[in-house]
Every structure is written in C-alpha cells, then in structure tokens.
Amino acid sequence: MRELRVISVSSAVLALLAIGLTAAPAAADTAATISIDGDGRSVTHLAGSGQVNELQVTPMGAGTGVRRVAFNDEVPIRAGEQHCVQPDPNDATRVVCELPTADASSGEIRILLGDGDDEFFTDAPGVSVVHGGSGNDQLHAHSAHTVIGGQDDDMLMGGVVMHGGDGMDHLMGDDRGQVLTGGRGADHIEAHGGADTVHAGFGDDHVTGGSGDDFLSGGFGDDTVHGDSGNDTLLGGPGKDVLSGGPDTDTILW
C-alpha cells in the first residue's frame, strides 16, 4: 500500500484565500495599480474595485541587467512611482515594468484581480501568485506557481498549486506534478499528466487523475474519482462515492 502524502498549505497562501472577503467596497471602475517593492524585484497588480479585467502579462525579454514585463488590459491601469511606465500616454490600459535583474526566476509577479468576472492570461516566468477574488473568473496561468480562484465559479489552468475556493470550479492541470484543491462546491478536477495530489474538498465532485502516479481524495460529498493510467491511490471520504482505478496497479481506500 502506498504511503499517504500530506500536503501543508503555507500561512501566506491561507491569507491570500481570504483576500476580497474582508476588504471594504470602493467606488466602481477604480483604476488598477501596478506597484514594485523597495528593492525593485517584486511587482503587484491590484485590480480596481468594480473592474472586469481581461489582463495579459507578457514577457518582453531582457536588457542589460533588467527584464521587462508588460501588463495589458481592457480597463485602465495606473503605473507605480518607480520602474513602471505607460509607454503610450494615450493608452491607459498598458503598463511596462522593468525589473533590475535579467534572471526570470528572480523576483515575483503577484496578480490580485478582486471582484468581477475576470479573465487572466500569462506565459511569463516569475508569476508567483494569481488570485481571482470574487466573480466567475477564467485564469489561464500556465507559468504561474500558485493559482487561486476565490469565490464563485472559476476555471483554473496551470499552476504548480491550484485552489478553486468556494463555488463550482473547474481545475485543469498539465504534465507537471501538481497539487490541486477544489475547496467548497461541486468541482470538476482534471489532473492530466504528472504525479499529482488532488483534494476535491466539500461537495459532489468529479475527479480524473490522468497519466502519472496520483493521489486522489474525494473529500466530503458524493464524489466520482477515476485514476486513469498510473499507479494511483484513491480515497473516497464521507459520502456515497464511485471510485475506479483504471489501468495499472492502484490502491483504493474507503
């Protein structure tokens, strides 16, 4: 029998899960802000209250000792005081930031989308956190490390760590080994390739492991869990569950 894997969630991620739940409402259509921390290595995008974002974060290559990242949206973005500019003064929806390092693995890019039914796209390296906030969000974040849906019904793609949050969420993994957590609500989780760890959470969930030696836990609710190929471990949890291992040598726990 395979040893169960226990995944801990850092206090930083738990704090991010609460973003948008306690903030006081502001006026609608406030511009988003892009700010860089004191050492110039970390960038935070904070959406304005009432905005519906269609944000794209795009790498623009590196210069001598710097790398450039572009933020493009359908709504206004306000550049911070240092290292970020609006290249076209007539276009308030585009900001370019320069980070004082040519190393894409150095520094962090944090995306906080807030309320609204937002869309997000990136293949830029160095995106550490994407948080959808409230609203039915679509987060295409293949290069990001941690992707959090937040409240409502979200679609998440990519991320080493994904958390759907509250609502009926759809989480889609890739060929890496990932940690996918559904949260509350009837979620649909597709792990795809890699040795994945899936915790479906509360609700009547549908989980598919894909290829790879996966650990799949249905959690609370009437869940359907299918291991697919690979030597998988399936755990049903409380509720009326349907568990199927698929090809290869699987372990099913009730």
Which positions does each model-derived feature cover?
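Secretory targeting and sorting signals
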Residues: M1-A28
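Short linear S-[DN]-x-LW-Φ motif typified by the pepsin-like aspartic protease active-site region
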Residues: V9, A28-G80
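Surface-exposed or flexible loop/turn and strand-edge residues in extracellular/cell-surface modules
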Residues: G40, V52, V66, S106-E108, ...
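Beta-strand repeat scaffolds of extracellular/surface proteins
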Residues: G48-G50, M60, E74, P125, ...
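Acidic/polar low-complexity surface segments
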Residues: N72, G80-T101, I148-G150, M157, ...
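Right-handed parallel beta-helix
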Residues: C84-H131, N136-L139
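Glycine-centered beta-turn/loop sites at beta-strand termini
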Residues: L113, T122-D123, H131-G132, A141, ...
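Consensus positions within tandem repeat domains that build extended binding/scaffold surfaces
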Residues: D117, N136, D153, M168, ...
